[in-house]
C-alpha cells in the first residue's frame, strides 16, 4: 500500500477502513457478537483510534496470528454457543447487507455459504512453454463474509494447518463438506492497493448521496 500504517487503519471518508467494515457488519447483523482479530502490537493503536473517532460499536478484540488460520482459530475460542458465524475481511467495507443476510440464511439452512462473483476478464494459465487460454466460465472470484454453522466451523478448525488453506471455505472443504455459493456484490473489493482505496472512496461517496 506504500504506507507504514496498517491498511485496515488507513483513512476512508474521515475514519479508518476497519470502522466502516465493522459498522456495516453491525448494521447487517444486529444483536450479533463481533470479534476482531488484530496483531497484539496494534491493540493500543486501535484503542486510541476508537477513542479519537468515538467509535461505539461493541466488539471484542483477540490476538491475531501469523496466518489467517491462526487468527480465525483464536477468534473461535470466544464462540461458546451454537450459532452461525460470519468471517469477514477487515478491509472489505463495501459489503452489501443483502449479501451478508443471504450468506447467513444459506449457512443457517445448509451449514455453509460464501459470496462469489463472475470473472469478466480473460484468463490464461502458465505452462512450461508459455501460456494457454482457459475458460473463465469455469472459475469464480471468492469474497467474504464466509458463513458457516458453528458446528461445522469449529470442527473444521480442529484440523492441523495446511498451506492449501487460503480461506475459511478451503478449511471446511478439507473435511469433505460442500460449500454453498451465493451471488456477491462486485463493489465488495478488498482494499490492498492505493488504487483500491481510491475506488472505495468513490463508492462511499456514491452510497452517501
For each feature predicted by the language model, list its residue ranges:
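N-terminal glycine-rich phosphate-binding loop and ensuing alpha1 helix
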Residues: 1-43
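Acidic helix N-cap motif at the loop->helix transition within catalytic regions
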Residues: 44-49
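Residue-level signal for inorganic ion chemistry
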Residues: 9, 18, 75, 88-89, ...
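Residues at the starts of beta-strands that form the adenosine-phosphate
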Residues: 32-34, 112, 178
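A recurrent flexible, glycine/aromatic-enriched loop bordering the glycosyltransferase active site
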Residues: 132-142
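Conserved donor nucleotide-binding strand/loop of the catalytic core
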Residues: 54-66
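Conserved alpha/beta core of the MobA/IspD/sugar-nucleotide pyrophosphorylase nucleotidyltransferase superfamily
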Residues: 140-209
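Conserved beta-loop-beta/alpha segment of the NTase-like Rossmann-fold superfamily
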Residues: 67-129, 143
